[in-house]
Swiss-Prot record:
Coarse class of the protein's main subcellular location: cytoplasm
Quaternary structure annotation from Swiss-Prot or TrEMBL: Homotetramer. Forms an RuvA(8)-RuvB(12)-Holliday junction (HJ) complex. HJ DNA is sandwiched between 2 RuvA tetramers; dsDNA enters through RuvA and exits via RuvB. An RuvB hexamer assembles on each DNA strand where it exits the tetramer. Each RuvB hexamer is contacted by two RuvA subunits (via domain III) on 2 adjacent RuvB subunits; this complex drives branch migration. In the full resolvosome a probable DNA-RuvA(4)-RuvB(12)-RuvC(2) complex forms which resolves the HJ.
Gene3D superfamilies documented for this protein: 5' to 3' exonuclease, C-terminal subdomain, DNA helicase RuvA subunit, C-terminal domain, Nucleic acid-binding proteins
InterPro entries: DNA_helicase_Holl-junc_RuvA_I, Hlx-hairpin-Hlx_DNA-bd_motif, NA-bd_OB-fold, RuvA, RuvA_2-like, RuvA_C, RuvA_C_sf
Pfam families with a match to the protein in the record: HHH_5 (PF14520), RuvA_C (PF07499), RuvA_N (PF01330)
Domain notes: Has three domains with a flexible linker between the domains II and III and assumes an 'L' shape. Domain III is highly mobile and contacts RuvB.
Superkingdom of origin: Bacteria
Compartments (UniProt record): Cytoplasm
The protein's name in its UniProt record: Holliday junction branch migration complex subunit RuvA
Source organism per UniProt: Allorhizobium ampelinum (strain ATCC BAA-846 / DSM 112012 / S4)
Region (Flexible linker), start-end ranges: 144-153
A GO molecular function held by the record: four-way junction DNA binding
Entry keyword annotation includes DNA-binding: yes
Length: 205
């Protein structure tokens, strides 16, 4: 099994990169987000690899971090999500944004990924809600929201407030952190309008 490739970029395709390792070139399939972060041909590259072995083929999937690779595997534990859809999700959302979306039960955020319909998005946020924090890698906003929300799912006001802040130009991480802080500082039970005000107050500090 191949766990990591270290070499130079030989060629970048639409959905893959060719990695030259001491004269042997490996095809690693990557998300569009990962491909956009790569350098130019001839530059050094390090990719974390997930190896798929099938009866008639061997396929490599490449990632910029071990965390992204873990998410790739976790996403595929949900029915209806294969390698192609998992890569599409990781191209649409960073691991941190994905963790936030699951913590908030934010189905529309996940459904933005090509190939992810409402039913698959629902399965993802439902089945992964108790698994996602282990893959955030730090005490991020997803964990903060989970702590404030307890074991329940995010209420409509919470989801609406996060969505409103992102519409104002804040990143999902910033919005989720702000709403988590708002809930902690007296916003529990508040409607979306109040949560938005409290969230903006947190962001202005």
């Amino acid at each position: 099994m191949i766990g990591k490739l270290k070499g130079t970029i030989d060629e970048i395709g639409d959905d893959h990169v060719l990695v030259d390792v001491h004269g042997v070139c490996y095809v690693a399939h990557c998300s569009s987000r990962t491909l956009a972060r790569l350098g130019s041909p001839g530059e050094a590259i390090v990719l974390f690899i997930e190896t798929y072995v099938r009866e008639d083929q061997l396929k490599l999937f490449g990632f910029m971090s071990a965390l992204e690779r873990e998410w790739f595997n976790l996403l595929q534990s949900v029915q209806g999500v294969g390698a192609k859809v998992a890569l599409a999700i990781l191209a649409t959302l960073t691991p941190s944004e994905l963790a936030n979306a699951i913590a908030l039960q934010d189905k529309p955020a996940i459904a933005r990924a090509p190939g992810v319909g409402p039913k698959v998005a629902l399965r993802l946020v439902t089945e992964l809600k108790n698994k996602a924090p282990a893959f955030t890698g730090d005490a991020g906003s997803a964990i903060g929201l989970k702590q404030e929300l307890g074991e329940g799912v995010a209420s409509a006001p919470v989801s609406d407030a996060v969505s409103a802040l992102t519409n104002l130009g804040y990143s999902r991480d910033q919005a989720a952190n702000a709403i988590a802080a708002a809930l902690k500082n007296g916003g529990e039970g508040a409607d979306s309008a109040k949560l938005i005000r409290l969230g903006l107050k947190e962001l202005s500090r």
